[in-house]
Amino acid sequence: MMASASLLIGSYLLLLMLLARPLGKGLAHLVADRPLHGFATAERGLWRVSGVENQGMRWQRYLLAILLFNAAGLLLLLLILMNQASLPLNPQQMPNLSWDLALNTAVSFITNTDWQAYAGESTLSYFSQMAGLTVQNFLSAATGIAVAFALMRGFVNREQGELGNAWRDITRITLYVLLPLSLLMALFLVSQGTLQNLHGYLDLTTLEGAKQTLPMGPVASQEAIKMLGTNGGGFFNANSAHPFENPTALSNFVQMLAIFLIPAALCFAFGDVVRDRRQGHALLWSMSLMFVAAVVVVMWAEVKGNPHFLTLGADSAANMEGKETRFGILNSSLFAVITTAASCGAVNAMHDSFTALGGMVPMWLMQIGEVVFGGVGSGLYGMLLFVLLAVFIAGLMIGRSPEYLGKKIDVWEMKMTALAILVTPVLVLLGAALAMMTDAGRSAMLNPGTHGFSEVLYALSSAANNNGSAFAGLNANTPFWNMLLAFCMLVGRFGIIVPVLAIAGSLAMKKVQPAGNGTLPTHGTLFIALLIGTVMLVGALTFIPALALGPVAEHLHMSGH
């Protein structure tokens, strides 16, 4: 088992880095806002027709463009979901969504969360899935990458204050990155057996004589961007555990690669943009070390399983509950860590059925801000916030003014960094407290005791950090939970984007200071250790008390302590 686990983790990381390096080079080209060879004329025509000016924006204008763009997407998606019964491509005659579920779903998809308080195959029409959810999967991913581009430019621009043009960034990211990759991914998934049609559902008679309905639909086209954009919202309720979404072991492995592909490539792009590849490599090393540690813990916990299984007469204590036999424990554990380290939230196994420790690690990966590779764009700018915090702590220890990449880190940057890092913990902890204090919150819990609290904590962690996965034992489709989680998703997304762009704008106004003898190297082993320690320390201080009431207590109870 250890050899299989090592081979799986090693082959995954090797292929990931081989694919991410060339993509990172292309992303760096987009950050520089240079026209692509052969597309310059078409681009100029597109900008003229759309009225987009070829000039940079300061951080306030960049932020306003991002907010207006996402507000328009929210309104359009809300209208589609609340009127889907009157729209085309609805062969199953799906009714309109209630206002609270429609609002929750619209907020979920424009924030790249893809939290789903519904079952897609029994709730949404094909039009809602294609024109509503799939479109927002592209646009929310492009938004995150655009913000990361703006922050990168903040580090390299000198006394300009401009961060690029948000409209150009979102358009170019969608056309040159997300669409081509999604097309290739969709074709691959179709070759593996993923559905892609507009047929009505099939009514069949099984060999036992029972009646069964097989859902159909344009699955592969949504599945591709769901993974590449770290969106995670499944066409079916079972998500990537469903054989119509994820048919084979090969499709499962490629889906895992797709989740981390753009986040890893952005780290390589960061090194190219700042003209020091070691900076990007340091981020990748930090992320990879934390990732491997998390995978090892989850695999160990699930293989060790539950000792009560043996007392009940099972052949093994290994925990196969909630997992597909075609994927097994190792692939399910790896997928769980990948999807929660990123802001994806897609699942090929039910996280609610993991052991207490096996479920706690994915929850904790979300709680630290999903900075272990993280979401497309959000993972990079989230980790760079921790880099600024680590540089500040190091500056306090050695008595020097903190600086990073030649830019001095002042009070303004640290205030914005602290604000961004504190947004999601406040949402999670206060939201969990509110849910446990109210009848409307507690009534949705289908399990009592420590595991019930873990389900509540997981839901708030997932929503506030824009992940979207869930412990399924929570009945979240109620007005209370739809509104609470929608609020957490909105604030968790844009409450971080605002200070990140403010930091980028401030850095873009500064001179680059030449490195001196006392400058802290931010690419060596010492800084990697400091960065990992900073992430771990913030996560530990913030969430250990809450985790102790949930998964830790559940594990001790399971172990007989």
Curated annotation (Swiss-Prot):
Q: Which cellular component terms (GO) are annotated to the entry?
A: plasma membrane
**Pfam families reported for this sequence:** KdpA (PF03814)
The record describes its membrane topology as:
Multi-pass membrane protein
* GO function term, MF aspect, one: P-type potassium transmembrane transporter activity
Q: Is Transferase there in the keyword field?
A: no
Can you tell me where the transmembrane regions are? 1-21, 62-82, 132-152, 173-193, 253-273, 283-303, 327-347, 356-376, 379-399, 416-436, 483-503, 526-546
Where is this protein chiefly located?
Answer: membrane
State the compartments where it is located.
Answer: Cell inner membrane
Alphabetical UniProt keywords: Cell inner membrane, Cell membrane, Ion transport, Membrane, Potassium, Potassium transport, Transmembrane, Transmembrane helix, Transport
Q: Which InterPro entries does the UniProt entry name for this protein?
A: KdpA
Entry similarity comment: Belongs to the KdpA family.
Q: Which PANTHER family match?
A: POTASSIUM-TRANSPORTING ATPASE A CHAIN, POTASSIUM-TRANSPORTING ATPASE POTASSIUM-BINDING SUBUNIT
Purpose: Part of the high-affinity ATP-driven potassium transport (or Kdp) system, which catalyzes the hydrolysis of ATP coupled with the electrogenic transport of potassium into the cytoplasm. This subunit binds the periplasmic potassium ions and delivers the ions to the membrane domain of KdpB through an intramembrane tunnel.
**Subunit record text:** The system is composed of three essential subunits: KdpA, KdpB and KdpC.
Q: What is this protein called?
A: Potassium-transporting ATPase potassium-binding subunit
Q: Which organism is it from?
A: Erwinia tasmaniensis (strain DSM 17950 / CFBP 7177 / CIP 109463 / NCPPB 4357 / Et1/99)
Q: Which gene encodes it?
A: kdpA
